Amino acid sequence: MADTRELPVFAYIDDIKQLQELRQYLNKHESVKLDPTGPAETAKNLVEICSTLHVLPLWSQDVDLVLNSISSLIVVVPGEKCEPVVDAFIKNVSPKFYKGIGWGSHAGIAVRVLSNLYKGYSNFHTVQEKIFMALVDMCAEARLIGELECNLETLHDRFNTWQTPVEGQREILRAVHRALLVDQRADQAAKVMTALLGTYTEKDAATARDDAMECVRTAVVDPKSFSFDHLERLSAVKALKSSDPLMFTALELFISGTLKDYQQFVAKNPKFVTDYLKVDEVILLKKIRLLTLMSLAEEKNEIKLDELAKQLDIHADETLEEFVIDAIQVNAISGKINEMANTLIVSSYQHRRFGSDQWVLLEKRLKVLIANLKQTHNNVHEVNQRIEAL
């Protein structure tokens, strides 16, 4: 039996009477032909009732009351008999039948009920895992994935608790990724997809083609991502070099290429952006321009605006200034335009690659920082000594 302390109570009548009333209510719909009494065993009785729940949103004004009533009965089913009941419930209370956005929609109602069921099965890991998967899919339909605790740390903790096999982990990560994308959370979706690819090794990397392609696609189109070299180190992505050379070339382009490289690539592969990356080319043009600016900033911290306009294929007017402002706002670079000198002064920038050279540079900067802090500490100590000597 599930932990009923985790669920609200929806009916104050005995189970048999409640089951009969549910059957009587559901039989109001012409397509439902339930026996008025049903099997004596609660589990079998509920399986029959749950098999009709796919039609409930079509006619009932009391979807929430009916689902809550049924869920209060499901949790009293003994543990060894509850799995078929839960299977029937989540099969028929799914995004295929429960639609809408937000808590007030049919999908939102289903999210609330599934959440209660999920909490009630904390001691039954197999059942709880199934409910969680259904909950993620329903959250995607209702655009409520932000309300579900599904960050990577939490997911890994759950996988350990449930002892989820690798393929099961991948299935859940794919579902979370889809839900995040639907809810316009591309940066989080990219992290989830990277974690998914991390489950592959060199032994099975060749089987990860679809996941690897989706990982690259999600990362490239994410407006907040500017560094992609970490993807190159994943076995599943490395395998794209032979299984899908075009996608791998696109990844390399966004790792280190420029606007000119991108334009040449698109000229050779005109349908790649729409067919493979499935994104408006305007978005990618802005992305590659930002990346090109970051590359220029790595080479020098003072860039002539005329040169910048040429490299970015943007008119050297207010349009260029607006682009630079956007670049600063998304933290691609930090700096300011010197209108008198007609230059862009770059004070800092994001690295497109973070390899050994960048680690060496970081080490040098940290050493300088530590030395400065020591000098400041010594100066303060000397001042204190002088004050005490007065």
Swiss-Prot record:
| PROSITE patterns (UniProt xref) | PCI
Tell me the GO BP annotations in alphabetical order: cell cycle switching; cytoplasmic translational initiation; formation of cytoplasmic translation initiation complex; oogenesis; protein deneddylation; regulation of oogenesis
Q: Where is the PCI domain?
A: 188-351
What subcellular compartments does it reside in? Answer: Cytoplasm
Predominant localisation class: cytoplasm
Q: Which GO terms describe its molecular function?
A: translation initiation factor activity
Q: Which InterPro entries match?
A: COPS7/eIF3m, eIF3m, PCI_dom
The UniProt record lists the keyword Protein biosynthesis: yes
Keyword annotations of the record: Cytoplasm, Developmental protein, Differentiation, Initiation factor, Oogenesis, Protein biosynthesis, Signalosome
What's a Pfam family this protein contains?
A: PCI
Q: Which Gene Ontology CC terms are recorded? A: COP9 signalosome; eukaryotic 43S preinitiation complex; eukaryotic 48S preinitiation complex; eukaryotic translation initiation factor 3 complex; eukaryotic translation initiation factor 3 complex, eIF3m
Function description: Component of the eukaryotic translation initiation factor 3 (eIF-3) complex, which is involved in protein synthesis of a specialized repertoire of mRNAs and, together with other initiation factors, stimulates binding of mRNA and methionyl-tRNAi to the 40S ribosome. The eIF-3 complex specifically targets and initiates translation of a subset of mRNAs involved in cell proliferation. Component of the COP9 signalosome complex (CSN), a complex involved in various cellular and developmental processes.
Report the sequence similarity comment from the record: Belongs to the eIF-3 subunit M family.
Q: How does it assemble?
A: Component of the eukaryotic translation initiation factor 3 (eIF-3) complex. Within the eIF-3 complex, interacts directly with eif-3.F. Component of the CSN complex, composed of csn-1, csn-2, csn-3, csn-4, csn-5, csn-6 and csn-7. Within the CSN complex, interacts directly with csn-1 and csn-4.
- Tell me the protein's name: COP9/Signalosome and eIF3 complex-shared subunit 1
What is the organism of origin for this protein? Caenorhabditis briggsae
Name the gene: cif-1
